[in-house]
Amino acid sequence: MASNFEEFVLVDNGGTGDVKVAPSNFANGVAEWISSNSRSQAYKVTCSVRQSSANNRKYTVKVEVPKVATQVQGGVELPVAAWRSYMNMELTIPVFATNDDCALIVKALQGTFKTGNPIATAIAANSGIY
């Protein structure tokens, strides 16, 4: 099986200003991807997979999204991160799930955050579900 620890587009802006993250570290079973921005302004993704029981694998995915801003110090405009948003997700899949089962799970995840769906709309508007 080929490695899947490779660069990918995290934020798709239609090809203009896309945010790509590249492999940066793989230690203790945790894969890390980071964007090319300065460390304080970088997007970061981590993922680990572990056996949570005899019958289950648990995927833990974390995404950090920075609020990119600038600040003037001594007449020089410097980039700073005003704050960060964090997403943490745990996904448990039975070890006996087929590839088709897992592909369906991925489609469900994509649908959950698809633009226009209630959860994505609430997050995009920084509001709740009502």
Swiss-Prot record:
<keyword id="KW-0694">RNA-binding</keyword>
<dbReference type="GO" id="GO:0005198">
    <property type="term" value="F:structural molecule activity"/>
</dbReference>
<protein>
    <recommendedName>
        <fullName>Capsid protein</fullName>
    </recommendedName>
</protein>
<comment type="function">
    <text>Capsid protein self-assembles to form an icosahedral capsid with a T=3 symmetry, about 26 nm in diameter, and consisting of 89 capsid proteins dimers (178 capsid proteins). Involved in viral genome encapsidation through the interaction between a capsid protein dimer and the multiple packaging signals present in the RNA genome. The capsid also contains 1 copy of the A2 maturation protein.</text>
</comment>
<keyword id="KW-1142">T=3 icosahedral capsid protein</keyword>
<dbReference type="InterPro" id="IPR002703">
    <property type="entry name" value="Levivir_coat"/>
</dbReference>
<keyword id="KW-0946">Virion</keyword>
<keyword id="KW-0167">Capsid protein</keyword>
<feature type="region of interest" description="Viral RNA-binding">
    <location>
        <begin position="32"/>
        <end position="105"/>
    </location>
</feature>
<comment type="subunit">
    <text>Homodimer. The capsid proteins form dimers that assemble by group of 5. Twelve such pentamers are linked together with free dimers. The homodimers binds to the viral RNA via an operator hairpin, but also to many other RNA sequences in the viral genome; this interaction probably shifts the virus from the replicative to the assembly phase and ensures specific encapsidation of the viral genome.</text>
</comment>
<dbReference type="GO" id="GO:0003723">
    <property type="term" value="F:RNA binding"/>
</dbReference>
<dbReference type="InterPro" id="IPR015954">
    <property type="entry name" value="Phage_RNA-type_capsid"/>
</dbReference>
<comment type="similarity">
    <text>Belongs to the Leviviricetes capsid protein family.</text>
</comment>
<comment type="function">
    <text>Acts as a translational repressor of viral replicase synthesis late in infection. This latter function is the result of capsid protein interaction with an RNA hairpin which contains the replicase ribosome-binding site.</text>
</comment>
<dbReference type="GO" id="GO:0039617">
    <property type="term" value="C:T=3 icosahedral viral capsid"/>
</dbReference>
<dbReference type="Pfam" id="PF01819">
    <property type="entry name" value="Levi_coat"/>
</dbReference>
<dbReference type="GO" id="GO:0006417">
    <property type="term" value="P:regulation of translation"/>
</dbReference>
<keyword id="KW-0810">Translation regulation</keyword>
